[in-house]
C-alpha cells in the first residue's frame, strides 16, 4: 500500500488549498500593487480551498493536513536560525506538519459534504497549542465575497452543488448561491482621512544584529532620523515596529530624548519593559501630554510562552530561553491609547492576528507593530496581511501596520482602499 504521506493527489489538493496565499505572496514579492489583480486571482483561487477540503478522500486527509501545515507554517521554524538549535529546523517543520495532519484527519473524517461544510467553517475555532493562524476564512480577504460565516457557507454550498450535482438546476442554484455571497459594498472605499497624517515606519534591522549591543547606537540614530523626517512632513504621529528599541526603554537615557521630541510629534514605539523579574513586550506612546504604555496580551506560542503542561514547560523554557531570570509575561487585558481626540488600540505582532483583540473592542482604529525579521524571507508577511485584512473587513476596523523587514501599510475595512508603504532602500 502506498504511504499516505507521499500521496501525490493529497499534495496537489494541498496546493489548491493554499493557492490564494501563495499567489498573493508572489504579487507581494514583485511589488505588484494593482488591487484588481489580487482581487481577481483571490476570488478565483480562494474557493479552491473549499473544493480541496470537500474532495479529499478520508484516506488522504492526514496527508492533506500534513502538506497544508508544511506549506502554510514552515516559516515558524525559521526563527531557529537565530538560536543554538539551527539543526532542529527540519524537525520543527515536520512536527508542525504532523499536528495539522492529525487535525485535518479529524476534520475530514466523514466524507459527507455537509459535514465537510461544518468542519470547514469550524476549523478557524481550533487552535493547536494556542496558534490561531489557520483561518481558511481569511483566504477570502481579498475576494469579492463577504467574509462572514454565513456568506462563506453559501460559497461552500455552491462548491457542493457545482461539483457534485450533475443536473442543470443544481448548477443554477450554485451560481445563485455565489451571487448571494458577493460583497456589493466591497468596492466602496472607506474614509481614511483620520489616519492620513500618521507616518508608518518600515525598518530593515537584521535579526542577528537587532539585539547586538554594539548596534544599539545605529538603531537609536535611525529612530531619531525617522522622527525628524516625519516632523518635516508635518506628521502628527510616527509609528515604529515591534521592539524597534530592543532593550528596556524605561531604563535607558534614550527615553528622555523621545520625551523631548514628543513635544512636536507623538511617537509610538515597540520596546521591552521590565517589572521585577517579569519581561513585557510593550508599546510606548510619547506625546506632549504624557507617556502611555500597553503590554502585549496574547503571547506567541513557543516564541514567548510555552503552551504546555508545567512539567514540560519549565525544562523547555530553560532549554530554549536560557538561564535568564526574566521570562515573558502578558498583560491581563487590552489597552486603548488616546491622543487628542484620536483613540486607537495598539497591538504587537502575533496578537494583531487574534480574534479577541477585535471582537469586543470599541476602537475603530488599530495599530499593529511587528518584527518580521525572524521569518524573512518567507510567506509569513503575506499570510499576516491576509489575516489582518480579514479582521479589518470582518469587524469593520481600520488597521495600520508598522513592520521590520516587511511592508508597512494601512488596511481599509472595505475591499479597496489599502495603502502600502514599501521598505526603504
Swiss-Prot record:
Any one annotated GO CC term: plasma membrane
Keyword hit for Membrane: yes
Subcellular location as annotated: Cell inner membrane
Membrane-traversing stretches: 12-32, 34-54, 60-80, 88-108, 120-140, 142-162
EC number: 2.3.1.269
Active site annotation, chain numbering: 242 (proton acceptor), 296, 349 (nucleophile)
Membrane topology annotation: Multi-pass membrane protein
SUPFAM superfamilies linked: Carbon-nitrogen hydrolase (SSF56317)
Signal peptide residues on this chain, from the entry's feature table: none
Alphabetized UniProt keyword annotations: Acyltransferase, Cell inner membrane, Cell membrane, Membrane, Transferase, Transmembrane, Transmembrane helix
Gene3D superfamilies, per database record: Carbon-nitrogen hydrolase (3.60.110.10)
This protein's name: Apolipoprotein N-acyltransferase
Provenance organism: Helicobacter pylori (strain ATCC 700392 / 26695)
